[in-house]
Structure formats: C-alpha cells, structure tokens
Amino acid sequence: MAPRPAMSHSSAFLLPSPSAAAAGADADGAAYALLVLNQRLPRFAPRLWDRAQVRVCADGGANRVFDGMPELFPGQDPDEVRRRYKPDVIKGDLDSVRPEVKEYYSNMGTQIVDESHDQDTTDLHKCVAFITENSAIPNKSNLCIFALGALGGRFDHEMGNINVLHLFPNNRIILLSDDCLIFLLPRTHTHNIHIERSIEGPHCGLIPIGAPSATTTTTGLQWNLDNTSMSFGGLISTSNIVREESTVVTITSDSDLIWTISLRHHS
C-alpha cells in the first residue's frame, strides 16, 4: 500500500499578523473565509474577520455581528464599527435575523440569500456550500473556512455542525469558540499539527465521531496512542495533553477523527 500523503495544520491564523490580514491570505498561500453563526462572538472575531476574503453570516449570525462587534471595541462609535465589519452575505432560513438588522446590512450592500425553501440542511451546511461553490475567492484549492458560533448552545446544533465537517471532508473547516477549536482529520492523510503554545493547549482530544477507529497512532501527547482502537462505548482520547516539549503532534488513523484543542484566554 502506498504511503498516505501528509497534511499540516496550524493555528497561526489566531496570531496577530497585520500584513497577512491585509492580504487576506497567509504566506503559505492559504485563503480564508469566515462564517458567523448565531452564538456570542469570540474575542478574536475581529482578527479572523480581517484575515478573511469572504465573510458570511448564517441567518441569526448577522445579529451577533451587529450587536457583538461594537461590544468588542468599547469606546469606539458603534455605527463606525458596524460599517467596518459589514458581512458580504447573509444566508439561511432568515427566521432568526432581526428585520432591522437585515435591512441595515441590505442598505449597505450585503447580499441577502433566502434559503427557507431548503429544510434538509443546516445553515452552516448552506453557507459552506455557498463558499465552496459560489464565493468570489479565485483559488479554492487552499481554502480554509473559519466557523464562529458553531460550538456552544444547543447540543443538537453542535452535533449538526460537527456533521458538516464529515459532509465536507475535502474542505478545511475549523469550528471555533472562545474556549477551543475543532476540525476533521481525514483518514486519507497522516497529520502534522503544529502547536502554537502562546494561543492553544495544552488540553486536547481525538474523537472518532463518524466511525470507530481500529488503529490510531500518535506522537507528541502525554498519553500517546499506539495502534490503539477507539470507539464510543470504549476508549476515546479526551482530556489528553500536548507534551511540554512537543512542537508538533502527529496522528495516523484508519478512521476520520475530530481533533480538538483548548484556546488560551489571554490570546
């Protein structure tokens, strides 16, 4: 069997980097899109907004931007902050966005897309599909999508959002909250996760949500896995820790896994 290709991951997008933010891409050529769902904005929302080339609010996520962005800039004029952080698109069922918020952004040129006819997919699913199929990002081969507000709140919403990671396994999608981030590790690759200690860790986890794993091997963790099987009803790797001396965590598995790591609140 041919060796699997390696995939590298990094949370460096959470580090301050004005030059990269202005370009909408990192030095490695990664392009970013931002999705905002209907949960409280994390403290680093403006940083990711500035990095993104496309900003999409999923329905009630527009309320969160309208209300929450000025709260992240105390002392600044709220209307000026709202003008600065105007979403490109509001998309979804449009049953949660407040009428006055929808009108405000529509008058500023935001595209409003009513998807209320589609009751079979979540707002996150609709927005990811829009970004990957229809957005103005010219080269989507190295696209990374940040989803804010996908964690926290109702558990069924969280599970629906995690399911979207499995529905789009060939796209890099990162779900973020103030406390942690998660993303999918496709079984088609081995994975090298570069640890940014100033902003993340040490607590982490590897979870076989989609299907059991017969064999998973890791390096760089306090409790490494060595051809270990994982499944619900058996062992899953939660409350693990990135070793203090580790700069990279490596993971190889026969199953898709969810990686999660804590975020430091001073970042």
UniProtKB/Swiss-Prot annotation:
Enzyme class of the recorded protein, top EC level: transferase
SUPFAM superfamilies: Thiamin pyrophosphokinase, catalytic domain, Thiamin pyrophosphokinase, substrate-binding domain
Catalytic reaction equation(s): thiamine + ATP = thiamine diphosphate + AMP + H(+)
Keyword Kinase attached: yes
Subcellular location, record wording: Cytoplasm, Cytosol
Enzyme Commission no: 2.7.6.2
Signal sequence residues: none
Family assignment from sequence similarity: Belongs to the thiamine pyrophosphokinase family.
Name this polypeptide is given: Thiamine pyrophosphokinase 3
